[in-house]
């Protein structure tokens, strides 16, 4: 086998490979003979079909299969010999074949050589926070609202009430699509509607009809409504006031806490909030580290890796639509390209961090991650057993652990400062960004 390597552009490589033609001819002949022994063709006894008949019927397909196998086998031998690391499947083009040699060209992209730079220039502002009694009380209030019951009242509506309304919206006297509803239930103060709508409903009683004027935000999702001033004619059908449950041991039972009452519920809430805070703090630091790593290291990315990541993201996006996905057109690749490029780049850079630091997933860390994740379920031990009994799930957790270790390795050389943050503000921001 003779091999020549050519760098065409960037990460693309072209191998021109020449192998003895007899490799193909012998394999084709052997395959034709074997097929002749197996073939059942009318007019011939089993095992007695002439090779010439088999060649006439199946020769072209057999030769194509053999040629493909020869190209694949010799390509693998060539990249091993030339120490090349393909980032995707090659494209084969069969060349001229003379009496002695079969020539073909394999074109593919390789992984880039990654040399990490600027690791000591990465800056990280590490947030610190804790769950306070006030934070637990705020969560208790949220849970009370989630378990509220509502009853009709004969008074003016206020924030926290639910208002059942009919409304008709118009712009310059013309109704617009989506601007009309009947018996629409709106929680005042929820922020579901555009600015000014909910506050315009406040202070009115059931049975009243009134107009409000609001302006659609400039970033509103409907292009034809952005920045437009609209008038809404509203009929308030019913005002429903919230009845919040009392915070006591009976309240705790609503959440399955039967032993320890209210104090046990608060302890469980604090534990869950603490776990979520820890995860959010780690995610924040990780994001800063990765952003710094990307800023300091610019590498060329193989297109096959980007294309593969686009398909993963596209599939995940379609799954979120559930049963509706079957009737949807394929989402364009452009929607995912930027995110795919980032993920590929992060993967390559972290791979080099792992290689440079000779990192291996720590078993204790893997089990700790599984236990932390399982603690959010009703039966944590069952979840832990499931993960440890499923090699694919276990490998995913090893990858998470290894990524954590790589981030920690980068933190050792990064410029690190601490900043105390308010729990509620930090978690709200983390939720919006997530």
Curated annotation (Swiss-Prot):
PANTHER family: TRIGGER FACTOR CHAPERONE AND PEPTIDYL-PROLYL CIS/TRANS ISOMERASE (PTHR30560), TRIGGER FACTOR-LIKE PROTEIN TIG, CHLOROPLASTIC (PTHR30560:SF3). HAMAP family: Trigger_factor_Tig. The keyword Cytoplasm applies. Involved in protein export. Acts as a chaperone by maintaining the newly synthesized protein in an open conformation. Functions as a peptidyl-prolyl cis-trans isomerase. Its EC number is 5.2.1.8. It is found in: Cytoplasm. This is Trigger factor. It comes from Shewanella sediminis (strain HAW-EB3). Residues 160-245 form the PPIase FKBP-type domain. It comes from the Bacteria.
């Amino acid at each position: 086998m003779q091999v020549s390597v050519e760098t065409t552009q960037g990460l693309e490589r072209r191998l021109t490979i020449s192998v003895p033609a007899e490799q193909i001819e012998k394999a084709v002949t052997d395959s034709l003979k074997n097929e002749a022994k197996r073939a059942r063709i009318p007019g011939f006894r089993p095992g007695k079909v002439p090779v010439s008949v088999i060649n006439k019927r199946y020769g072209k397909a057999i030769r194509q299969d053999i040629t493909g196998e020869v190209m694949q086998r010799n390509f693998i031998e060539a990249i091993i010999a030339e120490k090349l690391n393909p980032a995707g499947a090659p494209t084969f083009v069969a060349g001229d074949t003379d009496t002695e040699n079969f020539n073909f060209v394999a074109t593919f992209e390789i992984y880039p050589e990654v040399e990490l730079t600027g690791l000591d220039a990465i800056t990280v502002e590490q947030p610190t926070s804790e769950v306070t009694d006030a934070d637990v009380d705020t969560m208790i209030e949220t849970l009370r609202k989630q378990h509220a019951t509502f009853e009709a009242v004969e008074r003016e509506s206020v924030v926290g009430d639910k208002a059942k309304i009919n409304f008709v919206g118009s712009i310059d006297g013309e109704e617009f699509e989506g601007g009309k509803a009947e018996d629409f239930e709106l929680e005042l103060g929820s922020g579901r509607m555009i600015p000014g709508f909910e506050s315009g409903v406040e202070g009115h009683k059931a049975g009243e009809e009134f107009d409000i004027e609001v302006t659609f935000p400039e970033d509103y999702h409907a292009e034809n409504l952005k920045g437009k001033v609209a008038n809404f004619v509203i009929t308030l059908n019913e005002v429903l006031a919230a009845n919040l449950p009392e915070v006591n041991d009976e309240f705790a039972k609503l959440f399955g806490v039967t032993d320890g009452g209210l104090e046990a519920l608060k302890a469980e809430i604090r534990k869950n909030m603490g776990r979520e805070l820890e995860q959010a703090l780690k995610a924040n630091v990780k994001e800063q580290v990765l952003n710094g790593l990307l800023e300091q290291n610019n590498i060329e990315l193989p297109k096959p890796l980007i294309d593969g990541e686009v398909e993963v993201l596209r599939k995940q996006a379609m799954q979120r639509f559930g049963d509706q996905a079957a009737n949807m057109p394929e989402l364009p690749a452009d929607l995912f390209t930027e995110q795919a490029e980032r993920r590929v780049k992060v993967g390559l850079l972290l791979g080099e961090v792992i290689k440079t630091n000779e990192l291996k997933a720590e078993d204790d860390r893997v089990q700790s991650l599984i236990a932390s994740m399982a603690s959010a379920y009703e039966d944590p031990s069952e979840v832990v057993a499931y993960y440890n009994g499923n090699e694919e799930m276990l490998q995913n957790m090893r990858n998470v652990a290894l990524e954590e270790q790589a981030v920690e390795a980068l933190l050792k050389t990064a410029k690190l400062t601490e900043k105390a943050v308010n729990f509620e503000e930090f978690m709200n921001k983390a939720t919006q960004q997530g």
